[in-house]
Swiss-Prot record:
Keyword list, A-Z: Ribonucleoprotein, Ribosomal protein
GO MF terms, alphabetically ordered: large ribosomal subunit rRNA binding; myosin binding; structural constituent of ribosome
One cellular component (GO) term of this entry: cytosolic ribosome
PANTHER family in the record: 50S/60S RIBOSOMAL PROTEIN L14/L23, LARGE RIBOSOMAL SUBUNIT PROTEIN UL14
Protein name per Swiss-Prot or TrEMBL: Large ribosomal subunit protein uL14
Keyword field contains Ligase: no
GO biological processes: cytoplasmic translation
Family recorded in the similarity comment: Belongs to the universal ribosomal protein uL14 family.
Signal sequence extent: none
NCBIfam families referenced in this protein's UniProt entry, alphabetically: PRK08571.1 (NF006344)
Length: 140
């Protein structure tokens, strides 16, 4: 029995290593007032029994704010991963990783809630999310 869905995608997103499972806490790299983001669920993950869904660079996930402004805390909101510590392979064969895990809060359309991003944004994320790329100070 062959595995289904293992072929390459036309355009789309290149498969990268997933470094942030459900329950992970990462830095919030925008100026919304949130200090960190807690991963609740990952968009588009079908899953398998007993396997934790995980997010990688460029993935949208459902998050809550654990530290930050009181008006942001105790609410469920979408966010996007912009950096991860786990090394992932680019198309040109080079492995890249960042010094922290970070995400930004967005709305359902992918538009940022904040207006600035601290630190670099992965190229993979910038290609998928143009509104995040326009607010990025540097793209790595």
């Amino acid at each position: 029995m062959s595995k289904r869905g293992r072929g390459g995608t036309a355009g789309g997103k290149f498969r990268i290593s997933l470094g942030l499972p459900v329950g992970a806490v990462m830095n919030c790299a925008d100026n919304t007032g949130a200090k960190n983001l807690y991963v609740i669920a990952v968009h588009g993950i079908r899953g398998r029994l007993n396997r934790l869904p995980a997010a990688g660079v460029g993935d949208m996930f459902v998050a809550t704010v654990k530290k930050g402004k009181p008006e942001l805390r105790k609410k469920v909101m979408p966010a996007v991963v912009i950096r991860q510590r786990k090394p992932f392979r680019r198309r040109d064969g080079v492995f890249i990783y960042f010094e922290d895990n970070a995400g930004v809060i967005v709305n359902n359309k992918g538009e940022m809630k904040g207006s600035a991003i601290t630190g670099p944004v992965a190229k993979e994320c910038a290609d998928l999310w143009p509104r995040i790329a326009s607010n990025a100070s540097s793209i790595a």
